[in-house]
Amino acid sequence: IAKYLNLNEDLTETLSLAHDLGHTPFGHAGEDALDECMENYGGFDHNLQTLRIVMFLENKYFKFKGLNLSIETLEGLLKHNGPVKDLDLVNRLIGLKTFKDKIKFSTYPSLEAQISAISDDIAYNNHDIQDGINANLFKLEELMEIDFFKSIYIKYKKKINKNNYKIAIYQIIRDSIDLMIRDLLTNTQKNLKELKIKSLKDISNSGQLLVCFSNKIQNSEKEIKYFLRTKMYDNKSVLKKNKRGKVIIKRLFKIIKSNPKKFLTKDQLTKDKFRAISDFISGMTDRYAINLYNNYK
């Protein structure tokens, strides 16, 4: 997408790869649980946690903390969801002075950052469809309930049989991603032309997202999200796993809080004990969190 629009591919790739660094174990359920644990200690947000990682926690150099990423990268990560609305949260987790007045919090992010954000949505929705089918939460044929997928499914319906079912899933998802990207490119070019976007300043002050779907595909995306909500996210087995993930996170927080010296370094504890606990837990994988929980339950 960035290449087609003659934008900075390296910046777009960096933002896309770095965005999920701040995710907790057990996805959004884990994030909600950790945020509840940190309610009285500043809260938790996975987007801002990504910034904490690249600015403070990942240390590779003698002269400074963090990875010394460009201000364009930091701004893109900070504004993953658009202009910054909760300055108080940013101040608690990062510190507004950290950016030294180099970032205007109320403006829109770069086109590269907008591409990264919407690409995340494209990948998220399509791969959740694929995962839902593979997990037997719904069947491929049920995609006919979504207008967007209906025409794609009909195109391959006669070819699908039990021997090529998995290939059919890949093909339909591939077509879906292709259609979304084509629509995104067409609509973005239309926006740039109509609003006469010529500079970074024009982008920042545009007052809207420029990299976005047409109204038709935006409505389709809402349909897809509703389908996934009813068929997958609200499924009893999924909710049960999410609940277990929350229990594990909260239990680990309690365990580490009761004896932080056993898990954290002296340097970590001298700054902010609870933030250090949050950093530690958010950096765990699902497997590590489960194993640690099993050792102490």
Predicted regions and their residues:
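Well-ordered mid-protein domain cores that form the structural environment of catalytic cofactors
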Residues: 1-47, 51-53
